Amino acid sequence: MKVDPNKEKALAAVLSQIEKQFGKGSIMKLGEDRSMDVETISTGSLSLDVALGAGGLPMGRIVEIYGPESSGKTTLTLEVIAAAQREGKTCAFIDAEHALDPIYAKKLGVDIDNLLCSQPDTGEQALEICDALTRSGAVDVIIVDSVAALTPKAEIEGEIGDSHMGLAARMMSQAMRKLAGNLKQSNTLLIFINQIRMKIGVMFGNPETTTGGNALKFYASVRLDIRRTGAIKEGDEVVGNETRVKVVKNKVAAPFKQAEFQILYGQGINRTGELVDLGVAHKLIEKAGAWYSYKGDKIGQGRANAGKYLTENPAIAAEIDKTLRELLLSNPSALASSASDDDNVEGNIDLETGEVF
């Protein structure tokens, strides 16, 4: 197609003027954008990284994680912090709920000596701290726990029973407009944890909604719905939760995928158990009866012992993880097909055998 040389000359002149006024890179052709390959941070779960499509949560974006109480929201964000710190990144935790347990965080692999933590008095203060950390360019990951606890200053200074209609939604809307551009420029990942509320009078459709208005739903590049689907037992003792995460919104890859994994109390995401399950599903690990083998060598009798072997041999675990990651990220539908048989399974899981009861 022939291009008018006068138009080309005019376009070059206006692009030059815009770059001179607003800085280099303020406008460019989309194909010239070198940041198109999105940098990501692992969630701590291989199946969730694959379900997200890009291999983890995207840097420079806003992410919302929501679900019922005790579903694993804070645990998932602490796993993200631990993964980021292993890569040498700086992380901050804005604890609006004033409920962060440093001992539990340490058990999940978080370096609490280098984790920045703030317990703000008001919602405005929390969001201003987020903005200041973002603009500094020195912080890579910020967690806000939670949107429901970001109480506007007017509500705190008022009396219980006073009406404060729409204050939190207005505060969040202003913050989103301010933060979105700064996050992109500083390449900072901002994760909001949110709670679920019920809409009154809803007869048809889903009555659940999240707090803080609609602004966060629009500005978030990724929204994750996390649910507890069953209990994990060792004998009669409950030692963890079966967890399902649905990717409700995804601007960096295909949405609506889901991942299932285990969260063990005091340990976090059961990564080795996940490697065993996915390894068997994709023929990397052989299973004969109760015995599991990798490259011809037996690694354990029973799923728990195979997982224990991988925990004690991190080099082999890393090798399996790398192979699975390359296989599944190049063909995400393989994860869906391997999980299809279990999509409707809800109940209790025996940690040793992996059987549902």
UniProtKB/Swiss-Prot annotation:
GO biological process: DNA recombination; DNA repair; SOS response
Keyword Signal set for record: no
Family: Belongs to the RecA family.
Keywords on record: ATP-binding, Cytoplasm, DNA damage, DNA recombination, DNA repair, DNA-binding, Nucleotide-binding, SOS response
Gene from which the chain derives: recA
Binding of ATP, residues: 67-74
Keyword ATP-binding on entry: yes
SUPFAM superfamilies: P-loop containing nucleoside triphosphate hydrolases, RecA protein, C-terminal domain
GO CC annotation: cytoplasm
Organism superkingdom: Bacteria
Primary site of residence: cytoplasm
Functional summary from the UniProt entry: Can catalyze the hydrolysis of ATP in the presence of single-stranded DNA, the ATP-dependent uptake of single-stranded DNA by duplex DNA, and the ATP-dependent hybridization of homologous single-stranded DNAs. It interacts with LexA causing its activation and leading to its autocatalytic cleavage.
Gene3D superfamilies assigned: P-loop containing nucleotide triphosphate hydrolases
Location within or outside the cell: Cytoplasm
Pfam families for the chain: RecA (PF00154), RecA_C (PF21096)
Name of the protein this chain belongs to: Protein RecA
MF-aspect GO terms: ATP binding; ATP hydrolysis activity; ATP-dependent DNA damage sensor activity; damaged DNA binding; single-stranded DNA binding
